[in-house]
Amino acid sequence: MLVGLTGRNAAGKTTVLEWFQTRGFLTGSCSDSIRSWLSENDIQPTRENLISGGRELRKRHGPGILAEMLLEAFEGEDAVIDSIRTPDEVYALRKRNDFVLLEVTAD
C-alpha cells in the first residue's frame, strides 16, 4: 500500500507518518527527491537550494517528477509519503493501484 499525506502545517501529518512507520511502512517526502538530486550534483541542501532544486526538477521533467522519483525508490513497497502538495504529485502517485491519499486535519 502507498499512502500519501496532505494537510496544513501542524495538522498532525508527522504523527500519522510515525504511526505507519511503527507498522513497517517505509517513509519519505517529496523533498527527499530534491535532496537526492542535490546530493548527486554536489549541491548543499539549504532551504534556498531545495526550493530552486525543486523548480529545476519540475522544469526539466514535469510537475509530478518529485512523486515519480519516490515511486521508483519505493517500487511496490508499503510506504507513506509526507507533504503531498500538488495535484500533479497525486496524479503521479495514482499510477500505483494501491495508492490512497489522506488529508490530515487537527483543531
What are these regions (language model features)?
Residues 16-17:
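Post-Walker A alpha-helix
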